């Protein structure tokens, strides 16, 4: 019985620290130092939430830039079912999916002569990725320009404006947040 008392007191102590103090402390510090990030990095227009800067959306209209395909269950970009397709590179099903995506992108982008960027036909590990490279966004410019009656130059400048450089210059590559880019496109129409 004497060995049980230290075990119980250690359990209660660790329960209070890891189940109470630590979560409360990280929540308070997160809200204090990083309130936007701690609340989901929500993009708002007035009182309306238009999306999150962290989660992609399923843009299918020709007037919008499209992000990476989503492999989430039930519906594209479902944040409650985050995950990749888990298909191996050697899996024939993955080849079929990629071929179908390439064909769909070619059909939607007939004015683009270069090859389809790989990131536009392969899902990310989370299935929720909202970033693509500026080159993948630029590949879609002819379609978006035609659908929105905008110039190639306007869209090129918009992509440059919304391109984000990596935190460390030589690690990573520039990316464009598709949700923010498409919301900026909507503002051009206003």
Swiss-Prot record:
InterPro entries: KdpC. Keywords: ATP-binding, Cell inner membrane, Cell membrane, Ion transport, Membrane, Nucleotide-binding, Potassium, Potassium transport, Transmembrane, Transmembrane helix, Transport. The chain crosses the membrane at residues 10-30. It is a single-pass membrane protein. Its main location: membrane. It comes from the Bacteria. The keyword RNA-binding does not apply. Disulfide bonds: none annotated. GO terms for molecular function: ATP binding; P-type potassium transmembrane transporter activity. It is found in: Cell inner membrane. GO terms for cellular component: plasma membrane. The system is composed of three essential subunits: KdpA, KdpB and KdpC. HAMAP family: KdpC. Part of the high-affinity ATP-driven potassium transport (or Kdp) system, which catalyzes the hydrolysis of ATP coupled with the electrogenic transport of potassium into the cytoplasm. This subunit acts as a catalytic chaperone that increases the ATP-binding affinity of the ATP-hydrolyzing subunit KdpB by the formation of a transient KdpB/KdpC/ATP ternary complex. Belongs to the KdpC family. This is Potassium-transporting ATPase KdpC subunit. The gene is kdpC.
